[in-house]
């Protein structure tokens, strides 16, 4: 019998969440963000589910893009961090990849490049996040230099990233959009600013292309505490199995460091998932988990390959019963909130030893 640490990936949920993005921005084209191995869901798995539904894919670098091309995907692919070195330009031309250009050296490299075919580029504007991109006062000159490069296609796009859109009450997003619009004023070409939070919460950010990311995987992009949340379907169920049921006495400690002790005589389940599977070691006692279809909580510290759960008040649980760490009744956002992190990190930190198993239906 295998250890059974696995993550089922619901292809129907991925497509349903993309339809939610489409409904929020019906006039725009969709650049589905599938970087970081499809947010941990599997790059080719996610691309396969969304082929024919998104107009383009966005990944981090040429390695991810070339993997998609090798797997047969012909959609437009945008490299969100652009070229990391001059030789990435030839790779982009060979694989028909689109480049986000955010630095002067990239502009100069394109000006001097002799490529087998021209490339499409997106000029990144630093509208206020201060991570990558050209300051607003440099955008016009950078655009002019790109138009003079013989290896750059004429339809240069403009792109920015929103730093605070996850808080629908933060005025920083409006300021960023004003900065972006002013920086690109009078220049032709498509615009893109909306991440998942922009798609769902900031219609003014939609422009020509939207870039849904975390929402495709069923997690809310918002952190502002408003009651209204998007109706998104979790695409991943992270699952293990109960490998032991222990009947402990009042006062018995559980796990490393004896940080948690049984308040009464009680059953405790041991589940075959640990921090070696990407589950956060710092998850506190009380973090929600589903066991045998019933909601309960963690007790004690997380081990490398195991964790313990409270079985009090549940219908009988037996060895071999399923445990779902997130997905189903327990959302990844709940686990992330208990751990002081975000769902993005939970998805992306999952290692290869956790099997990804695509399913195409309503049941995870």
Curated annotation (Swiss-Prot):
The modification N6-(pyridoxal phosphate)lysine is found at residue 35. This is Alanine racemase. InterPro entries: Ala_racemase, Ala_racemase/Decarboxylase_C, Ala_racemase_C, Ala_racemase_N, Ala_racemase_pyridoxalP-BS, PLP-binding_barrel. Belongs to the alanine racemase family. The keyword Iron-sulfur does not apply. Gene3D superfamilies: Alanine racemase, Lyase, Ornithine Decarboxylase, Chain A, domain 1. It comes from the Bacteria. GO terms for cellular component: cytosol. One of its GO terms (biological process) is D-alanine biosynthetic process. Its cofactor is pyridoxal 5'-phosphate. The gene is alr. It holds the Pfam family Ala_racemase_N. HAMAP family: Ala_racemase. It catalyses: L-alanine = D-alanine. The keyword Transport does not apply. The active site is at 35 (proton acceptor), 256 (proton acceptor). Pathway: Amino-acid biosynthesis; D-alanine biosynthesis; D-alanine from L-alanine: step 1/1.
């Amino acid at each position: 019998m295998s250890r059974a640490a696995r993550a089922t990936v619901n292809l129907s949920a991925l497509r349903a969440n993309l339809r939610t993005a489409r409904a929020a921005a019906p006039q725009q084209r969709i650049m589905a963000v599938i970087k970081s191995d499809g947010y941990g869901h599997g790059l080719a798995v996610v691309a396969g589910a969304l082929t024919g539904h998104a107009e383009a894919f966005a990944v981090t670098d040429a390695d991810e893009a070339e993997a998609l091309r090798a797997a047969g995907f012909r959609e437009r692919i945008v490299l969100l961090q652009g070229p990391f070195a001059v030789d990435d330009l030839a790779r982009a031309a060979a694989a028909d990849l689109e480049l986000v250009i955010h630095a002067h050296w990239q502009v100069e490299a394109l000006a001097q490049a002799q490529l087998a075919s021209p490339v499409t580029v997106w000029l990144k504007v630093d509208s206020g996040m201060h991570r990558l991109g050209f300051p607003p006062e440099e955008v016009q000159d950078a655009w002019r230099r790109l138009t003079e490069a013989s290896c750059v296609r004429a339809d240069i796009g403009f792109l920015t990233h929103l730093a605070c859109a996850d808080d629908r009450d933060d005025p920083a997003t409006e300021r960023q959009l004003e900065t972006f619009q002013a920086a690109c004023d009078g220049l032709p070409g498509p615009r893109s600013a909306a991440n998942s939070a922009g798609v769902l919460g900031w219609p003014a950010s939609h422009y020509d292309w939207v870039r849904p990311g975390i929402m495709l995987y069923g997690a809310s992009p918002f952190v502002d505490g408003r009651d209204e949340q998007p109706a998104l379907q979790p695409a991943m169920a992270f699952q293990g199995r109960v490998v032991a049921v222990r009947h402990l006495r009042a006062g018995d400690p559980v796990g490393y460091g004896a940080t948690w002790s049984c308040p009464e005589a009680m059953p405790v389940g041991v589940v075959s998932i640990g921090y070696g599977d990407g589950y956060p070691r710092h998850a506190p006692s009380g973090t929600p988990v589903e066991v045998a279809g019933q909601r309960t909580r963690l007790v004690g510290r997380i081990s490398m390959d195991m964790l313990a759960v409270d079985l009090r008040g549940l219908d009988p649980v037996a060895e071999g019963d399923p445990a779902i760490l997130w997905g189903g009744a327990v959302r990844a956002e709940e686990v992330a909130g208990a751990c002081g992190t975000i769902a993005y990190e939970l998805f992306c930190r999952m290692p290869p030893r956790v099997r990804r198993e695509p399913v195409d239906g309503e049941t995870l």
